[in-house]
């Protein structure tokens, strides 16, 4: 083995990612033309993650359920409640921050030609339709609700299959997991390409006009990540939550920040869950499920941008309406489903609570896309790191009870 390969093997993945991050920033500042040419490194990495994630989830969930023995305990229900509690708590934090530090928008006159859902019923209907999607179509389009539905269905059916069949499914799961490990090893190069290209192409000039709005958004996400989530985890495990919280932010949040897709970060979260020694039958289901419904960052984005529009238009907001907005934002956030920028398209739905017409609401969406370089990255980092955090908290709480 060459000295370079030995050094790479000795250096931790997080350290390598940090080196790639700093190198990407330096290249974008000093040689932006070269940085733009290296954008393909980031594209290849994100594409590889997105390609492997649907197959990984399908095979892993199916294998987990097919090989599940009667009497083995899983902790999906408490994790599901943690996901819902965390998303609602994030929406409440966003409402409080927007009331304390109201933001004003300079709404653009250009109309965004985007298709946004018409109501909560439509969001729930879309989720139901996603669940009964054709399995091949679900895999092709990374429809994780449909993938989960078919994986669970096939897994339950294969529980009655022969040991040989279940062994083949388990071997497939191990094979796909090995491929994922190889892809994740290229994360430092991918992060290097993503950071250098993003800074070289967009720069930070476009964000300067929205500093207050960004401060409220990022502030809410940091508060949820460093205060609210640790409180929820402490309530579950009854000990210092910060070692676990910081590990999840460092090993899951950093990668998610740059891939900007909860779906693409599923392999990273599964690898971290394995590293933490969590219950495999639990995390193989809860992590892909979290990428679909655990959307604390999306709830914050929907709430803050909606209340910014409300404040700009001078519409009064009473407490019951604010509480209703928190509930609506939490429900709508579940429809964001790991799509980069997906939460922005749900803003018109929340704006409709205040009678804001679609034309103005879509201008707010346009503002969201302008600040999306930071907003979407921070949102995904919070969403994805919380998936593994709550899974770990629930698993550790159950282990303490059974000890």
UniProtKB/Swiss-Prot annotation:
NCBIfam families: PRK13628.1. The chain crosses the membrane at residues 14-34, 45-65, 79-99, 138-158, 175-195, 214-234, 295-315, 327-347, 353-373. The gene is sstT. Keywords: Amino-acid transport, Cell inner membrane, Cell membrane, Membrane, Symport, Transmembrane, Transmembrane helix, Transport. GO terms for molecular function: neutral L-amino acid:sodium symporter activity. It is found in: Cell inner membrane. InterPro entries: Na-dicarboxylate_symporter, Na:dicarbo_symporter_sf, Ser_Thr_transp_SstT. This is Serine/threonine transporter SstT. Gene3D superfamilies: Sodium:dicarboxylate symporter. One of its GO terms (cellular component) is plasma membrane. Pfam families: SDF (PF00375). Belongs to the dicarboxylate/amino acid:cation symporter (DAACS) (TC 2.A.23) family. It is a multi-pass membrane protein. It catalyses: L-serine(in) + Na(+)(in) = L-serine(out) + Na(+)(out); L-threonine(in) + Na(+)(in) = L-threonine(out) + Na(+)(out). The keyword Mitochondrion does not apply. GO terms for biological process: serine transport; threonine transport. Involved in the import of serine and threonine into the cell, with the concomitant import of sodium (symport system). It comes from Pseudomonas entomophila (strain L48).
